[in-house]
């Protein structure tokens, strides 16, 4: 299965490439009141509102730098973007590379690739379920998904 690799601080992560819609340069964001602490704001992406998340805050990493790129992902009727420090490339991963499940529920598992370990993210679990419930969850709905139309 193909994944796209990226870095947050000095740690490398991957996400299945089929969940990635695109990678864009960091646009101007509009701040919103009363959103979860990890939501940096929203932007207009091709005529659609896109919520942009600080993944470092969401997974408990230190660091104030947000990175220059935003990875736009979609999974199970939601769509959002998150800042990445850099893209490391495309990785071909097979199940024999799975190392162990992570203690953080948003993270999938660790994978050994050559001499390094990479953490695989579970796109559909990145946003906490409680933040998808109620009116706040509308921020993350994919407007192009017929279920949300």
Label the model's feature ranges.
Residues 1-149:
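An acidic, low-aromatic, low-complexity terminal/linker signal
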